Amino acid sequence: MRILVTNDDGVHAPGLRVLEEIAAALSDDVYVVAPESDQSGVAHSLSLNDPLRLRRISERRYAVKGTPTDCVIMGVRRILDGREPDVVLSGVNSGQNVAEDVIYSGTVAGAMEGAILGIPAIALSQAYGRAGREKAFWSCAQAHAPGLIEKILATGVPANTVVNVNFPDCPPDAVEGVAVTAQGRRGYLVNVDARSDGRGNPYYWIAFDRPFSEPGKGTDVEALAHNRISVTPLRLDITDTPTLTRYAQALL
């Protein structure tokens, strides 16, 4: 099995090393093509106005000055060049990618690009942050991902579908099983944090507040709250079918 590994945290991210170890447990035919720098939050952006710079780190490890989407395209169309991977693995992201995170996530987008290219694809993220901790329990993903990936691939990933996997913020032995979930919803409050530099000139950061709300039943948010591994199938087709039907009746 040939595996293409990418991420959005960058080629030097600890989560990428974790995913390389996970991939190595599944296959000895693993290629890594990851962004040269952190691309968190770039979603499915594609570099059209800047050239892509490719740096070979080792025989099967490459860095691209571009987005996760660029990396998957470069990996499939240039580096592998006709030797198509059997699966694209994207991650392991430092932090969960659930609910609205999915829209912003470069990790999920890397997997989505694999699906667009007709390749089974799985996004993997490790939640963290409870009790003020600033480091992830990478051991959770390390322990549970290989077997879970094998089960997902054996079950099959349909065309135009991405599997979004999130590991809970707990040690491996505290995981309360696997939950197959729907994408959840949280109450996001998007703010602009205004600051001043040393010369008194203003600059700004996008900031998010997440007020507490009860997670929806059967969602990825609920699964993580109960220390379960969340497995969410996502489709590339984002058509709102009920509204399509209603509009067809009302507007035509």
UniProtKB/Swiss-Prot annotation:
Q: Which Gene3D superfamilies match?
A: Survival protein SurE-like phosphatase/nucleotidase
| Location relative to the cell | Cytoplasm
Note how many cofactor molecules are bound and how.
Binds 1 divalent metal cation per subunit.
Which residues span the membrane? none
Catalytic function, reaction form: a ribonucleoside 5'-phosphate + H2O = a ribonucleoside + phosphate
In terms of InterPro entries, this protein maps to:
SurE (IPR030048), SurE-like_Pase/nucleotidase (IPR002828), SurE-like_sf (IPR036523)
Show the SUPFAM superfamilies listed in the entry. SurE-like (SSF64167)
Q: Does the keyword Membrane apply?
A: no
One Gene Ontology cellular component annotation held by this UniProt entry: cytoplasm
In this chain, a divalent metal cation is annotated as bound at: 8-9, 40, 93
User: Which Pfam families would you find in this protein's record?
Assistant: SurE (PF01975)
Q: Which GO terms describe its molecular function?
A: 3'-nucleotidase activity; 5'-nucleotidase activity; exopolyphosphatase activity; metal ion binding; nucleotide binding
Q: Required cofactors, per record?
A: a divalent metal cation
The source's domain of life comes to Bacteria
Q: What does this protein do?
A: Nucleotidase that shows phosphatase activity on nucleoside 5'-monophosphates.
PANTHER family annotated for this entry? Answer: 5'-NUCLEOTIDASE SURE (PTHR30457), 5'_3'-NUCLEOTIDASE SURE (PTHR30457:SF12)
Q: Which HAMAP family match?
A: SurE
Give the family from UniProt. Answer: Belongs to the SurE nucleotidase family.
NCBIfam families assigned: PRK00346.1-4, surE
Q: What is this protein called?
A: 5'-nucleotidase SurE
Native organism: Methylocella silvestris (strain DSM 15510 / CIP 108128 / LMG 27833 / NCIMB 13906 / BL2)
Write the lineage as a comma-separated list.
Bacteria, Pseudomonadati, Pseudomonadota, Alphaproteobacteria, Hyphomicrobiales
Q: Which gene encodes it?
A: surE
